[in-house]
Amino acid sequence: MNVSVVTERRTPAYSSLAAGELNGLVARALLTEARLTPKPGLVDIRNSGAHRDMDLAAFERSTTAIAPWMEKFFIMGNNTAALAAENVLVMLRPLGMACENDMLQATNGVNTHRGAIFAFGLLSAAIGRLLARGEPLEQNRICDQVARLSRNIVAHELSARKAGKLTKSETHFQCYGLSGARGEAESGFRTVRTQALPVFNRVVQEHDDTHLALLQTLLHLMAWNDDTNLVSRGGLEGLYYVQQQAQKLLWQGGVLVEGGIEAMQFLDDELILRNLSPGGSADLLAVTWFLSHFPAGSLYPE
């Protein structure tokens, strides 16, 4: 059995965070997710999942390329804290595009982290805004700022009828009502806050095992997240198949019962055969690990 065990103890919650520290925390989040094994259909230590154009080394190179950009997102958020949040997104886009270019250069043109750049760019800018305003760094405040930065992004970018061929994201929304990464950001990472973090925290508390907590959390994300990466590869049938298989494993106890890891490996093999990769859930898992390093805070920040 070939699995990667995450043995790192959870670090104390951050009450403050320098821009340079943010780069390191994001890099650790991305590498923790990438190296977690076994992950059904995803790149990990065991194999390259349903991907023929990337491997773990590509994810590690990509992380090295994009992590330094988080400081730039942080600074932009910090410098524009006096502006209405919805007016800042347009200023973050050039940073995101430049960061993506560095990723593609590091991976020879392979998209390893486009979704993660979007998520962590917003999170970094949100943290910069909070610190500029003297507000505490708490999960709910950070996510509330992300929601404010992303306000109306689904309506503006996915709902509007445009001339020419629809993008994949527009097709997913206009045909199936799936808003993908944009919808998750606009909701302030609702799936992470209401599903992933509670599972992660509970398993860590009950089992003192970050590796098991991350795998169990991934299963929950695969079971309930409407992952548009799966729709791109296998249509709604592919999405529903993965959700049903993950739910089945959870009903059996997931990775917390005997044989759970082997069941994850079997599902990995099945998703590879079907060319299915839950990349959106992988991004949310990295976000979950990242946010777990901050206190939860009040549910409704002022």
Curated annotation (Swiss-Prot):
InterPro entries: CitG, TriPribosyl-deP-CoA_syn_CitG. It catalyses: 3'-dephospho-CoA + ATP = 2'-(5''-triphospho-alpha-D-ribosyl)-3'-dephospho-CoA + adenine. Coiled coil: none annotated. Gene3D superfamilies: Triphosphoribosyl-dephospho-CoA protein. GO terms for biological process: prosthetic group biosynthetic process. Pfam families: CitG. Keywords: ATP-binding, Nucleotide-binding, Transferase. The keyword Metal-binding does not apply. Its EC number is 2.4.2.52. The keyword Cytoplasm does not apply. GO terms for molecular function: ATP binding; triphosphoribosyl-dephospho-CoA synthase activity. HAMAP family: CitG. Belongs to the CitG/MdcB family. This is Probable 2-(5''-triphosphoribosyl)-3'-dephosphocoenzyme-A synthase 1. It comes from Salmonella typhi. The gene is citG1.
